[in-house]
Amino acid sequence: MHLLGHTLQFLSINPIGIGFGQHAGNLAIMQHGESAKCQAMYEVCWHIFFQGFHVRTHDFFNRQAQKLLVDNGFVVIPAQNPEFFIVYETNRYDGIPNFITTDAMLHNYHLFFNQLLKTVETQYLIPELKKLNTGMLAESQKQYESLKGTAWENAARRNVAFFAVGNRLLDPQAKIPEQVKEEVERELALIEAHQETAVSPVMTMGKSPDVLESLKEDYTQYIPRGHYVKSEELKNYFKTMMWYGRLTFRLKDQDEIRSAVLMTLALNRGENLKNWENIYRTTAFFVGKSDDLGYLDFQRILAEVYGNAVSLKQLATDSSQWELFMKKAAKLRPPAINSIPIFDETIQPDREREIKGFRFMG
C-alpha cells in the first residue's frame, strides 16, 4: 500500500500462516484473530511457517510498536527499503514468497506517467505557453484600442488584464500594461497568498464587487503540488495553467461573454490558435478533454451568426446578431463538474446558471 509517499511491507499473521506484501520505506506487520495476540511477539526472534516456507524474523519492535500490534492487530514501523524492487529481490534470495498487490503496479505506472508529463511540460508546453501569452496579450491590447468608447470596451480591457496575469505568473519579470496594473496586481497578490476564496478583481472589472453575483475564485488551488514543486519554472507553469483553466466567463453575465467572444477572435489571429491547440490537445491527451465551453464552441456559433469573417466593428454595432449569438450560446451544454465557489441552493437555486460559461483552457 502506498501511504504518504512511503512504501509499506505487510505481514499478515494468523494461526495458520503468514502472507507478504512489500512497500518500501516501512514495514507493517498485521495479525488476525485472538490467538495472534500473544507475548511471543516480544521475543528476540520468532519462527513462522507459511505453507512450507520457513521465515526467520529478527526483533525490530520497540515497546510502543509491540503494544500497538497487540492492541490494533497491525503496526507500521520504519524499514530500509526505498523502492519495491529491493524488497522483492531480497525476498528472492531469502526464499520468502512475494505477495504483489495491484498498487505496486499502479505506483510504477504513476511514476512513468508523472515523469513523462513533467518532460513534456518542461521541454514543450512551457515554450508554447510563453508564445501564447505574448500573442494573446498583444492581440487583446489591439482589441482594447479599437473598442474604446463602445459597449465592448470594458470586456476588452478585462482581457488585457486576464492575459497580463497569465503572462506575469509564467514570467515574474514580465511588464504589466499600465491600464490594468491595479487590478492585475491585486489578482496576483491573491494568487500568491493562496489562502482564501474571494471575488476576483479581474473578473469584476468595470463594476462594483458583489459577493453574491460577482465571480469568486478559490485561491487555495494555486498552491503548486506534485512534480510542480521541482523547479520555479514548473511552479510558474502550474499557476498559469490553473489561472487559464479555472476562470469562467459566465453566460449569465453579458460583459463576461463579450470577453469570451473577443478571446475567440484573438485566437484566430496570427499563431495564437496553433499555440493554443498545441497546449490544449496535449494536455487533453494526458488528462482528458474539458467539460466546459471553450474556443471550439464559441467559434462554431460565431460562424453561424456572423459568418467566417466577423469584425470588431460588426460586434460593437449589430445588436440583433449579438442577441442571436446569446440565444444560441444559452443552449450550449453545462459543465459536468463544478469548480466555481457558489452559495448553496437556498441562495443560488439555479446551479446551471451560476456555473455555465467559457474557459480559455478548460
Where do the model's predicted regions map?
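Compositionally biased, low-complexity intrinsically disordered regions
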Residues: 6-13, 24-25, 36-39, 50
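Residues marking helix boundaries in flexible regions
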Residues: 14-19, 30
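Charge-rich, low-complexity amphipathic helices
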Residues: 22-33, 256, 263
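Long, non-catalytic protein-protein interaction scaffolds
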Residues: 38, 42-362
